């Protein structure tokens, strides 16, 4: 299985890049975040042939999407979102024994308590999924740098949102309680430059002075089958890079 997660930062502005990414990578599963469009605003050309597609957005804010290749999962896919998702931030699908979710966690800058509540609900949902015996893959912009090294030294500031202890504790709690593994870190444990987001100024992206906030978290047995995980820093004009993960 090849899986891509990408905060596209506006699908209408980057529809050609999205089409190029799918055509080039031929992924089995695509998770998008921050599509910033309702289904009615998304042109038909963004429903690539050969994929089950679900756009879960409400206009110029937030929104997620999930695409599943017909050749990977031949049955009609049923997409859903959990009850705590009131801002178009989660879409999931059960692909046999694997539940895949595209998730966009609030940044927290405007309403930090709401971010913590969302993370708490996500942890509970993931815990319940794991308790039901399903493998779980959570992909997306989780807006938390899990470790200190997931923020470039030049970007670190005391007590900044995205690095606070309570945020990291919640995300670590999800990993522990749901039995999932940070695939990128598992495959490249000593790399301190696995960044996926860069502020759009001072050539920070070109200099790779960024944050690692986009993840693929997979149940341990599935994570053990992960072969590669790459942040495609050179691709596209979103402030986030696509993360491409392959499993055997």
Predicted segments, located by residue:
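N-terminal, active-site-proximal structural segment of metallo-dependent hydrolase catalytic domains
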Residues: 1-47, 52, 64, 174
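Active-site beta-strand/loop signature of hydrolases that rely on acidic residues for catalysis
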Residues: 6-7, 22-40, 100, 126-148, ...
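Metal-dependent phosphoesterases centered on the DNase I-like endonuclease/exonuclease/phosphatase
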Residues: 49, 120-209, 213
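Surface-exposed cleft-lining segments at the edges of enzyme active sites
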Residues: 81, 104-119, 155-160
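Short Gly/Pro-enriched turn/cap motifs at secondary-structure boundaries
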Residues: 55-58, 81-83, 205-208, 233-236
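Structured beta-strand-rich core segments of catalytic domains in phosphoester-bond hydrolases
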Residues: 36-106, 117
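Active-site-proximal beta-strand elements of phosphoester/diester hydrolases
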Residues: 1-9, 94-107, 139
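Conserved beta strand-loop-helix elements of the APE1-like EEP
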Residues: 60-75, 177, 201-224
């Amino acid at each position: 299985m090849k899986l891509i997660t990408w905060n596209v930062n506006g699908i209408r502005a980057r529809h050609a890049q999205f089409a190029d990414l799918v055509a080039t990578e031929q992924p089995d599963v695509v998770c998008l975040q921050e599509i910033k469009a309702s289904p009615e605003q998304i042109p038909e050309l963004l429903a690539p042939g050969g994929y089950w597609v679900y756009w879960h957005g409400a206009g110029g804010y937030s929104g997620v999407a999930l695409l599943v290749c017909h050749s990977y999962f031949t049955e009609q896919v049923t997409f859903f979102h959990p009850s705590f998702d009131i801002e178009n931030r989660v879409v999931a699908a059960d692909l046999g024994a694997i539940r895949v979710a595209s998730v966009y966690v609030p940044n927290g800058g405007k309403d930090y308590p709401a971010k913590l509540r969302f993370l708490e609900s996500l942890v509970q949902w993931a815990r319940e999924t794991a308790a039901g015996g399903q493998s779980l893959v959570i992909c997306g912009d989780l807006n938390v740098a899990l470790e200190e090294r997931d923020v470039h030294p030049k970007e670190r500031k005391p007590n900044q949102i995205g690095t606070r202890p309570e945020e990291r504790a919640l995300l670590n709690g999800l990993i522990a309680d749901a039995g999932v593994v940070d695939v990128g870190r598992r495959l490249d444990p000593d790399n301190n430059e696995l960044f996926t987001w860069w502020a759009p100024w001072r050539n920070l992206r070109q200099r790779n002075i960024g944050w690692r906030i986009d993840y693929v978290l997979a149940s341990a047995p599935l994570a053990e089958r992960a072969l590669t995980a790459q942040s495609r820093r050179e691709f596209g004009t979103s402030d986030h890079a696509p993360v491409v993960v392959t499993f055997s």
